[in-house]
Amino acid sequence: MTGTLITEDNAELFMGAVGTNALVNSDVFIGVVDEETDTACGVLSAEAVGDRTLAIRWIYVDESRRRKGAGRELINTLQDVASEIGAGAIVCSRNKPLGKDDVTEFFLSCGFVQDEFSPTPVYSYKISDISLRDIKKEKDQVMPLDEVSIKDWAEMENAWKELEAYDERLLDIIQNREFYDKNLSFAAMDSEGRFSGILVTSTDGQIIYLEDVFAVGDDPGITAYAMLKSLVLRADKSVKDPVISVSYENKEMLFLLDKVTGGRGVQTEENILLSYFMDV
């Protein structure tokens, strides 16, 4: 297997694994190819953050190629690219089960080290434990991202950039939109058609990872609740025994989930930071 930088010249080979905008929204986009079959078997997206640091945003290896060197080839190629461009470190933030797990062990075997100060609790809430109610103040129109056209998305992006609240957090949501579950991620518009919030998730089987929630306007708490309600209602119909997982860092959503479940969240994972430091 061979790792390679993904460019406009070879992007078509890898586009089946991610959306068409992934290349544009990645500072470094790497793929791995099985030379015998000329088949793409893995992709990795990284973003330049801070001072001379690359952050792994997304990594995927085809199930049939796992434990066969594809993942290691992706990381090795990323390390080579990082060295060539003068990066000082590569970082990866991820949720891991309590105790040891194979993915963390894989990163450690590739030379990464875990930040001893980084573990942050991740709590899970069964959707069956969530009790929803209508709130009279709810005025936002909430729509799943899979119903937002490319044109409407571009218009929303332009509107977001004019917000006083626009910052790196919202920019990160925008740039990584290709990697969210659009069926279970939502945008909100107020009664005048202005952007008022976004909730983004990723999924792994029955687990719905609440990646981030951003709300603005007169009552952002009501907007966040409206998007959470849309998530719960849609997930209940499309996922078997769904569970919402959220990091302790997202205190506003933890507070809201505790309120609608009667405090039934259970710690199931922890968020850790893994770092690879380049030789200088």
Task: Annotate each predicted stretch with a short phrase.
Residues I6-A22, V32, M156-L163, F186-A188, ...:
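Structured N-terminal alpha/beta-domain signature
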Residues A11, G16-E36, C41-I59, Y166-F214:
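A conserved beta-strand-loop-helix scaffold within acyl/acetyltransferase catalytic domains
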Residues V61, R67-S83, P220-A235:
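Conserved acetyl-CoA-binding loop-helix of GNAT-fold acetyltransferases
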Residues L74, G99, V103, M227, ...:
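Conserved short alpha-helix immediately C-terminal to the canonical SAM/SAH-binding motif I
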Residues F106-D134, K237-V280:
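Active-site/acyl-donor-binding loops of N-acyltransferases
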Residues Q79, A87-S93, G99-P119:
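Hydrophobic, ordered structural segments
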Residues M1-S26, V33, R133-R169:
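Short amphipathic alpha-helix that is part of the acyltransferase structural core
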Residues A82-P97, D236-Y248:
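Conserved GNAT acetyl-CoA-binding A-motif
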